[in-house]
């Protein structure tokens, strides 16, 4: 039960504290919105120029719907942006520790070297933010098995998120 709640609300300190006080998922909406707006407002800190901030804003709007999924950089989420622009935007968001692009490996021995020529899987920093921003909270809350929620993407997100905490990247 505790893991299911964690999977639903995430681990952002403000969200966890508010949930501990109120035990009400609906009361978390303004906190999630404040966090997301803060990320959107900080775009200029990450990117210079005209095009790059635009691509980052697009990712911060549409990218949540791609959590736990293998993505293509060119034309990401139905956009007209090319792979170079999207890749640069994702690299900046990775540096800001908002997300991680996880590349597959075919290695059978350690170290498992990522194959950066292949398509990555998108993992965001917090599953609670993903659930809120992708508007799948109700589906996740109602799921008997996390694998059934949102076509298994939340399971992909939470497992990848937890694995990333075992590295020095987070």
Where are these regions (language model features)?
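His/Asp/Glu-rich metal-coordinating catalytic cores
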Residues: 1
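Accessory nucleic acid-recognition modules appended to NTPase machines
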Residues: 7, 12, 16-170
């Amino acid at each position: 039960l505790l893991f299911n709640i964690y999977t639903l609300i995430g681990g952002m300190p403000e969200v966890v504290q508010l949930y501990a006080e109120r035990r009400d998922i609906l009361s978390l909406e303004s906190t999630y919105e404040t966090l997301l707006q803060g990320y959107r407002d900080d775009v200029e800190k990450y990117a210079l120029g005209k095009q790059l901030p635009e691509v980052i804003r697009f990712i911060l709007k549409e990218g949540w719907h791609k959590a736990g999924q293998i993505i293509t950089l060119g034309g990401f989420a139905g956009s007209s942006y090319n792979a170079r622009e999207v890749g640069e935007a994702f690299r900046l968001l990775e540096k800001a520790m908002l997300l991680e692009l996880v590349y597959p490996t075919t290695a059978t021995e350690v170290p498992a070297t990522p194959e950066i020529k292949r398509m990555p899987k998108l993992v965001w920093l917090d599953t609670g933010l993903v659930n809120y921003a992708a508007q799948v909270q109700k589906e996740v809350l109602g799921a008997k098995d996390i694998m059934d929620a949102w076509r298994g993407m939340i399971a992909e997100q939470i497992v990848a998120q937890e694995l990333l905490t075992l590295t020095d990247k987070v």
